[in-house]
C-alpha cells in the first residue's frame, strides 16, 4: 500500500522537508509514504481566495492516483486518536488500496475537494500552517505503523 500526501505548497522552509523525511524514510515499503507538491495558485490583487482554492483543488485532484481512497485534512473533519489512526491504517493496508491525504494551501481546501474525499480528518481544532501539517501527518502515520507492529516508538499508557 502506498500513502500519498498531496499538498499545496513548494519552497517551504528546509526544516519542514527534513521533518517530513525523517518519518517517511522510517516506514517500510509495504507502507510507503510519498509527497506530491502542487504549486499554489498565483495570488494577485485581482484574485479571490475562492478562486485560488478552486484552482488548487483541480490540481490536487488531478494528482490523485486512480482508485485511491482520498482523505482530506480539514479542521471541520473528525478528530482521530492515535489508536484510531492505527486502526484505519490497518484497514487500509488490509484493503490494499492506495490512500491519498490532501493538504490545502494557506486558504484551505475548496468544497469540491472536501466532497470528493471519502473522509475528512481534523488534526487539531487549531489552525495549523499547511507546511507543518505535512510533518504531523508523517509522524502520525509512522506512530500508527509503530503501534500496529509493537515498535517501542509508541509508548501508550
Swiss-Prot record:
Molecular function GO terms recorded: rRNA (pseudouridine-N3-)-methyltransferase activity
User: Where found in the cell?
Assistant: Cytoplasm
Q: What class of enzyme is it?
A: transferase
Give the stretches traversing the membrane.
none
- Keywords of this entry: Cytoplasm, Methyltransferase, rRNA processing, S-adenosyl-L-methionine, Transferase
The residues that the entry says bind S-adenosyl-L-methionine are 104, 123-128
- Supply one GO CC term from the record: cytoplasm
Its function?
Specifically methylates the pseudouridine at position 1915 (m3Psi1915) in 23S rRNA.
UniProt xrefs under NCBIfam families: PRK00103.1-4 (NF000986), tRNA_RlmH_YbeA (TIGR00246)
Its quaternary organisation is:
Homodimer.
The family annotation for this protein states:
Belongs to the RNA methyltransferase RlmH family.
Name of the protein in its database record? Ribosomal RNA large subunit methyltransferase H
Annotated source species: Nitrosococcus oceani (strain ATCC 19707 / BCRC 17464 / JCM 30415 / NCIMB 11848 / C-107)
Amino acid at each position: 500500500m502506498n500513502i500519498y500526501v498531496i499538498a499545496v505548497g513548494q519552497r517551504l522552509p528546509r526544516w519542514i522537508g527534513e521533518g517530513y523525511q525523517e518519518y517517511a524514510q522510517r516506514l517500510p515499503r509495504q507502507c510507503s509514504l510519498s509527497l506530491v507538491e502542487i504549486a499554489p495558485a498565483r495570488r494577485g490583487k485581482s484574485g479571490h481566495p475562492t478562486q485560488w482554492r478552486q484552482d488548487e483543488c483541480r490540481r490536487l485532484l488531478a494528482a490523485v492516483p486512480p482508485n485511491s481512497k482520498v482523505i482530506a485534512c480539514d479542521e471541520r473533519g473528525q478528530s482521530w486518536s492515535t489508536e484510531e489512526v492505527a486502526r484505519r491504517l490497518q484497514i487500509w493496508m488490509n484493503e490494499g488500496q492506495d490512500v491519498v491525504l490532501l493538504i490545502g494551501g494557506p486558504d484551505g481546501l475548496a468544497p469540491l475537494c472536501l466532497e470528493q474525499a471519502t473522509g475528512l480528518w481534523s488534526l487539531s481544532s487549531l489552525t495549523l500552517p499547511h507546511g507543518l501539517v505535512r510533518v504531523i501527518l508523517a509522524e502520525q502515520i509512522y506512530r500508527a505503523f509503530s503501534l500496529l507492529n509493537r515498535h517501542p516508538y509508541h509508548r501508550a499508557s
